[in-house]
Amino acid sequence: MTDENIRQIAFYGKGGIGKSTTSQNTLAAMAEMGQRIMIVGCDPKADSTRLMLHAKAQTTVLHLAAERGAVEDLELHEVMLTGFRGVRCVESGGPEPGVGCAGRGIITAINFLEENGAYQDLDFVSYDVLGDVVCGGFAMPIREGKAQEIYIVTSGEMMAMYAANNIARGILKYAHSGGVRLGGLICNSRKTDREAELIENLAERLNTQMIHFVPRDNIVQHAELRRMTVNEYAPDSNQGQEYRALAKKIINNDKLTIPTPIEMDELEALLIEYGILDDDSKHAEIIGKPAEATK
Protein backbone atom coordinates (compact mmCIF):
# COMPACT_ATOMS: atom_id res chain seq x y z
CA MET A 1 0.00 0.00 0.00
CA THR A 2 0.99 3.64 -0.43
CA ASP A 3 1.69 5.94 2.53
CA GLU A 4 -0.88 8.76 2.48
CA ASN A 5 1.83 11.27 3.42
CA ILE A 6 3.77 10.66 0.21
CA ARG A 7 3.30 13.36 -2.40
CA GLN A 8 2.69 11.65 -5.72
CA ILE A 9 3.48 13.87 -8.68
CA ALA A 10 3.59 13.31 -12.43
CA PHE A 11 5.29 15.06 -15.31
CA TYR A 12 3.37 15.15 -18.59
CA GLY A 13 4.17 16.94 -21.84
CA LYS A 14 4.42 16.75 -25.61
CA GLY A 15 6.84 14.19 -27.00
CA GLY A 16 10.26 15.79 -27.50
CA ILE A 17 9.61 18.72 -25.15
CA GLY A 18 12.37 17.62 -22.76
CA LYS A 19 10.03 16.21 -20.14
CA SER A 20 12.26 13.37 -18.95
CA THR A 21 15.32 15.63 -18.87
CA THR A 22 13.47 18.35 -16.98
CA SER A 23 11.96 15.92 -14.50
CA GLN A 24 15.24 14.12 -13.74
CA ASN A 25 17.17 17.36 -13.26
CA THR A 26 14.44 18.72 -11.00
CA LEU A 27 14.16 15.52 -8.98
CA ALA A 28 17.95 15.40 -8.60
CA ALA A 29 17.79 18.88 -7.09
CA MET A 30 14.98 17.79 -4.77
CA ALA A 31 17.09 14.81 -3.66
CA GLU A 32 19.97 17.20 -2.93
CA MET A 33 17.58 19.01 -0.59
CA GLY A 34 17.03 15.83 1.41
CA GLN A 35 13.81 14.64 -0.21
CA ARG A 36 13.41 10.85 -0.49
CA ILE A 37 12.29 10.13 -4.04
CA MET A 38 11.22 7.30 -6.30
CA ILE A 39 10.87 7.72 -10.07
CA VAL A 40 8.47 5.46 -11.93
CA GLY A 41 9.10 5.78 -15.66
CA CYS A 42 5.86 5.38 -17.61
CA ASP A 43 7.30 5.67 -21.11
CA PRO A 44 8.05 2.57 -23.26
CA LYS A 45 11.37 4.21 -24.25
CA ALA A 46 12.51 3.62 -20.64
CA ASP A 47 14.52 6.85 -20.59
CA SER A 48 13.02 8.34 -17.43
CA THR A 49 15.87 7.24 -15.14
CA ARG A 50 18.97 7.08 -17.34
CA LEU A 51 20.51 10.33 -16.07
CA MET A 52 20.06 9.17 -12.49
CA LEU A 53 21.67 5.81 -13.20
CA HIS A 54 24.30 6.84 -15.80
CA ALA A 55 22.75 4.19 -18.04
CA LYS A 56 21.38 3.85 -21.56
CA ALA A 57 18.06 2.42 -20.39
CA GLN A 58 17.02 0.58 -17.27
CA THR A 59 15.64 -2.96 -17.63
CA THR A 60 11.87 -2.63 -17.37
CA VAL A 61 9.29 -4.41 -15.25
CA LEU A 62 7.47 -5.74 -18.34
CA HIS A 63 10.67 -6.98 -19.99
CA LEU A 64 11.72 -8.94 -16.92
CA ALA A 65 8.18 -10.22 -16.39
CA ALA A 66 8.11 -11.50 -19.98
CA GLU A 67 11.42 -13.31 -19.43
CA ARG A 68 10.24 -14.93 -16.20
CA GLY A 69 6.71 -15.66 -17.33
CA ALA A 70 4.85 -13.49 -14.81
CA VAL A 71 5.39 -10.31 -12.82
CA GLU A 72 4.80 -12.31 -9.63
CA ASP A 73 8.11 -14.10 -10.30
CA LEU A 74 10.11 -10.86 -9.93
CA GLU A 75 11.93 -9.55 -6.88
CA LEU A 76 11.77 -5.85 -6.04
CA HIS A 77 15.56 -5.41 -6.12
CA GLU A 78 15.60 -6.62 -9.74
CA VAL A 79 13.45 -3.76 -11.02
CA MET A 80 14.22 -0.98 -8.54
CA LEU A 81 17.73 0.47 -8.75
CA THR A 82 19.28 3.29 -6.73
CA GLY A 83 20.65 6.33 -8.52
CA PHE A 84 21.96 9.83 -7.79
CA ARG A 85 21.50 10.87 -4.14
CA GLY A 86 19.62 7.69 -3.31
CA VAL A 87 16.79 8.21 -5.80
CA ARG A 88 14.92 4.94 -6.40
CA CYS A 89 14.45 4.19 -10.09
CA VAL A 90 11.88 1.95 -11.80
CA GLU A 91 10.89 1.71 -15.48
CA SER A 92 7.51 0.17 -16.29
CA GLY A 93 8.29 -0.44 -19.97
CA GLY A 94 5.91 -1.50 -22.72
CA PRO A 95 5.36 -4.03 -25.52
CA GLU A 96 6.94 -3.94 -28.96
CA PRO A 97 5.61 -1.07 -31.14
CA GLY A 98 2.28 -1.97 -32.72
CA VAL A 99 1.60 -4.86 -30.35
CA GLY A 100 -0.72 -4.54 -27.37
CA CYS A 101 -1.35 -1.64 -25.01
CA ALA A 102 1.73 0.31 -23.95
CA GLY A 103 -0.17 1.64 -20.96
CA ARG A 104 -0.40 -1.89 -19.59
CA GLY A 105 3.17 -1.62 -18.32
CA ILE A 106 2.25 1.29 -16.09
CA ILE A 107 -0.60 -0.60 -14.45
CA THR A 108 1.49 -3.74 -13.99
CA ALA A 109 4.48 -1.86 -12.57
CA ILE A 110 2.56 0.28 -10.08
CA ASN A 111 0.59 -2.69 -8.76
CA PHE A 112 3.81 -4.69 -8.35
CA LEU A 113 5.56 -1.83 -6.54
CA GLU A 114 2.64 -1.31 -4.15
CA GLU A 115 2.37 -5.01 -3.35
CA ASN A 116 6.11 -5.29 -2.64
CA GLY A 117 6.54 -2.31 -0.31
CA ALA A 118 8.38 0.00 -2.71
CA TYR A 119 6.55 3.07 -1.42
CA GLN A 120 7.95 2.90 2.11
CA ASP A 121 10.05 5.76 3.56
CA LEU A 122 9.46 8.19 0.70
CA ASP A 123 8.58 11.88 0.46
CA PHE A 124 7.83 11.96 -3.28
CA VAL A 125 6.93 9.48 -5.99
CA SER A 126 7.26 10.89 -9.50
CA TYR A 127 5.60 9.40 -12.58
CA ASP A 128 7.20 10.40 -15.88
CA VAL A 129 4.47 9.81 -18.46
CA LEU A 130 4.66 9.43 -22.24
CA GLY A 131 3.99 12.40 -24.50
CA ASP A 132 0.70 14.15 -25.02
CA VAL A 133 -1.73 11.28 -24.45
CA VAL A 134 -3.97 11.28 -21.41
CA CYS A 135 -6.05 8.23 -22.28
CA GLY A 136 -6.14 4.52 -21.56
CA GLY A 137 -3.18 3.12 -19.65
CA PHE A 138 -1.19 6.33 -19.88
CA ALA A 139 -3.87 8.11 -17.85
CA MET A 140 -3.62 5.46 -15.16
CA PRO A 141 -1.59 7.56 -12.68
CA ILE A 142 -4.32 10.22 -12.96
CA ARG A 143 -7.36 7.99 -13.35
CA GLU A 144 -6.59 5.78 -10.37
CA GLY A 145 -5.63 8.69 -8.12
CA LYS A 146 -1.98 7.62 -7.96
CA ALA A 147 -0.63 10.99 -9.07
CA GLN A 148 -2.16 13.88 -7.14
CA GLU A 149 -0.09 16.73 -8.59
CA ILE A 150 0.49 17.11 -12.32
CA TYR A 151 3.23 19.30 -13.78
CA ILE A 152 3.00 19.96 -17.51
CA VAL A 153 6.26 20.63 -19.36
CA THR A 154 5.61 22.98 -22.27
CA SER A 155 7.15 25.80 -24.30
CA GLY A 156 6.12 28.75 -26.45
CA GLU A 157 5.69 26.51 -29.49
CA MET A 158 2.18 25.92 -30.79
CA MET A 159 2.07 22.12 -30.51
CA ALA A 160 3.58 22.12 -27.01
CA MET A 161 0.84 24.50 -25.89
CA TYR A 162 -1.80 22.46 -27.70
CA ALA A 163 -0.60 19.35 -25.85
CA ALA A 164 -0.60 21.21 -22.53
CA ASN A 165 -4.22 22.20 -23.07
CA ASN A 166 -5.17 18.61 -23.95
CA ILE A 167 -3.45 17.31 -20.82
CA ALA A 168 -5.33 19.91 -18.76
CA ARG A 169 -8.52 18.54 -20.31
CA GLY A 170 -7.57 15.03 -19.18
CA ILE A 171 -6.85 16.26 -15.64
CA LEU A 172 -10.24 17.97 -15.50
CA LYS A 173 -11.95 14.71 -16.50
CA TYR A 174 -10.60 12.92 -13.41
CA ALA A 175 -10.32 15.86 -10.98
CA HIS A 176 -13.55 15.14 -9.13
CA SER A 177 -13.42 11.34 -9.11
CA GLY A 178 -9.69 10.87 -8.45
CA GLY A 179 -8.76 14.10 -6.68
CA VAL A 180 -5.95 14.94 -9.10
CA ARG A 181 -4.89 18.59 -9.41
CA LEU A 182 -2.71 20.66 -11.73
CA GLY A 183 0.41 21.95 -9.99
CA GLY A 184 1.56 24.23 -12.78
CA LEU A 185 3.21 24.65 -16.16
CA ILE A 186 6.98 24.32 -16.49
CA CYS A 187 8.21 26.32 -19.48
CA ASN A 188 11.22 24.49 -20.93
CA SER A 189 12.35 27.34 -23.13
CA ARG A 190 12.75 27.08 -26.89
CA LYS A 191 13.68 30.77 -27.09
CA THR A 192 10.54 31.74 -28.98
CA ASP A 193 9.41 35.37 -28.94
CA ARG A 194 7.87 36.59 -25.65
CA GLU A 195 7.87 33.00 -24.44
CA ALA A 196 7.66 33.54 -20.69
CA GLU A 197 4.88 36.10 -21.10
CA LEU A 198 2.97 33.75 -23.42
CA ILE A 199 3.13 30.78 -21.03
CA GLU A 200 2.16 33.00 -18.08
CA ASN A 201 -0.92 34.00 -20.08
CA LEU A 202 -1.73 30.39 -20.98
CA ALA A 203 -1.31 29.35 -17.34
CA GLU A 204 -3.75 32.03 -16.22
CA ARG A 205 -6.33 30.83 -18.74
CA LEU A 206 -5.87 27.25 -17.54
CA ASN A 207 -6.40 28.36 -13.92
CA THR A 208 -2.85 27.52 -12.90
CA GLN A 209 0.63 29.06 -12.66
CA MET A 210 3.81 29.00 -14.65
CA ILE A 211 5.71 27.50 -11.75
CA HIS A 212 9.10 28.10 -13.39
CA PHE A 213 10.73 29.25 -16.63
CA VAL A 214 13.70 26.99 -17.43
CA PRO A 215 16.08 28.84 -19.79
CA ARG A 216 17.71 27.04 -22.70
CA ASP A 217 21.35 26.17 -22.02
CA ASN A 218 23.70 23.86 -23.92
CA ILE A 219 25.07 22.55 -20.64
CA VAL A 220 21.97 20.35 -20.45
CA GLN A 221 23.06 18.53 -23.63
CA HIS A 222 26.65 18.27 -22.37
CA ALA A 223 25.38 16.60 -19.20
CA GLU A 224 23.04 14.30 -21.16
CA LEU A 225 25.91 13.07 -23.35
CA ARG A 226 27.56 11.90 -20.13
CA ARG A 227 24.24 10.43 -18.91
CA MET A 228 24.24 12.79 -15.96
CA THR A 229 21.96 15.43 -14.52
CA VAL A 230 23.21 19.01 -14.66
CA ASN A 231 23.27 19.08 -10.85
CA GLU A 232 25.81 16.26 -10.83
CA TYR A 233 27.78 17.27 -13.95
CA ALA A 234 28.10 20.98 -13.20
CA PRO A 235 26.68 21.64 -9.72
CA ASP A 236 27.74 25.30 -9.65
CA SER A 237 26.31 26.19 -13.07
CA ASN A 238 23.54 28.72 -13.61
CA GLN A 239 21.36 25.97 -15.08
CA GLY A 240 21.84 23.86 -11.97
CA GLN A 241 20.54 26.79 -9.94
CA GLU A 242 17.47 27.00 -12.19
CA TYR A 243 16.62 23.36 -11.50
CA ARG A 244 17.14 23.93 -7.77
CA ALA A 245 14.78 26.90 -7.91
CA LEU A 246 12.15 24.77 -9.65
CA ALA A 247 12.69 21.96 -7.14
CA LYS A 248 12.13 24.31 -4.22
CA LYS A 249 8.95 25.66 -5.83
CA ILE A 250 7.54 22.15 -6.26
CA ILE A 251 8.41 21.19 -2.67
CA ASN A 252 6.65 24.31 -1.38
CA ASN A 253 3.82 24.36 -3.91
CA ASP A 254 0.35 24.66 -2.40
CA LYS A 255 -1.38 26.08 -5.48
CA LEU A 256 -3.04 22.92 -6.74
CA THR A 257 -6.02 23.66 -8.96
CA ILE A 258 -8.68 22.12 -11.15
CA PRO A 259 -7.74 23.31 -14.65
CA THR A 260 -9.99 25.18 -17.05
CA PRO A 261 -8.91 24.02 -20.53
CA ILE A 262 -9.64 26.37 -23.39
CA GLU A 263 -11.12 25.84 -26.84
CA MET A 264 -8.90 25.69 -29.93
CA ASP A 265 -10.22 29.06 -31.12
CA GLU A 266 -9.08 30.70 -27.88
CA LEU A 267 -5.67 29.04 -28.12
CA GLU A 268 -5.27 30.26 -31.70
CA ALA A 269 -6.34 33.76 -30.66
CA LEU A 270 -3.67 33.68 -27.95
CA LEU A 271 -1.04 32.62 -30.49
CA ILE A 272 -2.14 35.39 -32.84
CA GLU A 273 -1.91 37.91 -29.99
CA TYR A 274 1.71 36.93 -29.39
CA GLY A 275 2.63 36.79 -33.08
CA ILE A 276 3.01 33.00 -33.31
CA LEU A 277 0.09 32.73 -35.77
CA ASP A 278 -1.14 35.27 -38.28
CA ASP A 279 -4.72 36.42 -37.95
CA ASP A 280 -7.43 35.03 -40.24
CA SER A 281 -7.37 38.01 -42.58
CA LYS A 282 -3.77 37.20 -43.52
CA HIS A 283 -3.95 33.45 -43.09
CA ALA A 284 -5.37 32.58 -46.52
CA GLU A 285 -2.79 34.77 -48.23
CA ILE A 286 0.23 32.99 -46.73
CA ILE A 287 -0.85 29.33 -46.94
CA GLY A 288 1.62 27.38 -49.08
CA LYS A 289 3.91 30.35 -49.73
CA PRO A 290 7.63 30.30 -48.83
CA ALA A 291 9.12 32.79 -46.39
CA GLU A 292 10.50 35.05 -49.15
CA ALA A 293 7.06 35.42 -50.72
CA THR A 294 5.41 36.51 -47.47
CA LYS A 295 7.82 39.34 -46.62
Swiss-Prot record:
Q: What class of enzyme is it?
A: oxidoreductase
Q: Which GO terms describe its molecular function?
A: 4 iron, 4 sulfur cluster binding; ATP binding; metal ion binding; nitrogenase activity
Post-translational modification, briefly? The reversible ADP-ribosylation of Arg-104 inactivates the nitrogenase reductase and regulates nitrogenase activity.
Q: Where does ATP bind?
A: 13-20
Q: Which residues bind [4Fe-4S] cluster?
A: 101, 135
Q: Please list every transmembrane segment annotated in the UniProt record, as residue ranges.
A: none
Q: Which InterPro entries does the record cross-reference, listed alphabetically?
A: NifH/chlL_CS, NifH/frxC, Nitrogenase_Fe_NifH, P-loop_NTPase
The UniProt entry, under Gene3D superfamilies, shows: P-loop containing nucleotide triphosphate hydrolases
Please give a single GO biological process term from the UniProt record: nitrogen fixation
Would the keyword Ribonucleoprotein turn up in this protein's UniProt record?
A: no
E.C. numbers: 1.18.6.1
Show the catalytic activity: N2 + 8 reduced [2Fe-2S]-[ferredoxin] + 16 ATP + 16 H2O = H2 + 8 oxidized [2Fe-2S]-[ferredoxin] + 2 NH4(+) + 16 ADP + 16 phosphate + 6 H(+)
Query: Keywords for this entry?
Result: 4Fe-4S, ADP-ribosylation, ATP-binding, Iron, Iron-sulfur, Metal-binding, Nitrogen fixation, Nucleotide-binding, Oxidoreductase
Query: Where ADP-ribosylarginine occurs, residue numbers?
Result: 104
What protein family does this chain belong to? Belongs to the NifH/BchL/ChlL family.
Listed under subunit, the entry gives:
Homodimer.
Task: Name it.
Answer: Nitrogenase iron protein 1
Q: Upper taxonomic classification of the species?
A: Bacteria, Bacillati, Cyanobacteriota, Cyanophyceae, Nostocales
